[in-house]
Amino acid sequence: MYPFKIGVMLDSFRLPIDQALDKAAEVGGQGLQVYATYGEMAPENLSHEARKAFLDKVYSRGLVISALCGDLGKGFTDPALNPGLIEKSKRILDLAVELETNVVTTHIGRVPENPGCDTYKIMQEACHELAEYADSLKAHFAIETGPEPAKRLADFLDTLGSRGVAVNYDPANLTMCVDDDAAKGVYALKNYIVHTHAKDGMRGTEPPYVEVPLGEGDVHWDEYLRALDEIGFKGFLTIERECGDTPEKDIALAVRFLEGKIR
């Protein structure tokens, strides 16, 4: 038995928010993650009253918020864009704290192999600022794994001297995108994992990778979950389903799959 909690990505249901909240509870989720980068959940579109109303809806269904998704789709590799992206990211973190979670997941762009290159330094500067702000709120910007091997990301994070920028661990992304070992990657990033996505996938050639239901891909779940337990992780495995025609069914099956592994 493992101490993990099961979450669901609210947007994966592809339904209006109230209906998606109902489904999240019905399938057996304990928590949820929701995109906060656009639409009605973006910080600029949510008054304090609306934020409280949303949180009340979450709690009334027996759920909590595991994290917000704050991926703005551009990374932090362009010094001309970074000031605006950093400012918006801070507002999303403010929203997260008001919604009683301390994690905002994001993508920063692919960490270069060469620590001496300009892009590496640009990303460092952006992440230093994000980390400092997150530390002030006792919160985390959590970088999603996948664009680079786990060890390279760990080395980058070590240069920041902070857990304000931490990790949202996605085993499928590592497996599909860079052919990394999901279990070994957990040990490489053990100091930084604050949230995880539960997703599975297979490497291939056409297309280069494909998402599949949990347990049907290349993620070795028993080894992966054991590794998370061994590093002391006690947080959320948040189910993210980005494709397929029957998201509710797929998410419910994923909940059952995880329950069978951790209960």
For every predicted segment, state its role:
Residues 16-22, 57-60, 74-167, 176, ...:
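Active-site acidic/histidine proton-transfer and metal-coordination neighborhood
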Residues 45-53, 80-88, 115-125, 148, ...:
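Alpha-helix N-cap and loop-to-helix initiation/capping positions
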Residues 13, 238-247:
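A short, acidic, flexible beta-alpha connecting loop/helix-capping segment that sits on the rim
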Residues 1-97, 101, 162, 191, ...:
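N-terminal pre-domain/capping segments
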Residues 2, 6-8, 31, 68, ...:
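Acidic/histidine-rich catalytic cores of soluble enzymes
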Residues 36, 108, 200, 241:
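Short secondary-structure boundary segments
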Residues 32-33, 66, 104, 196, ...:
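Hydrophobic residues within beta-strands of alpha/beta enzymes
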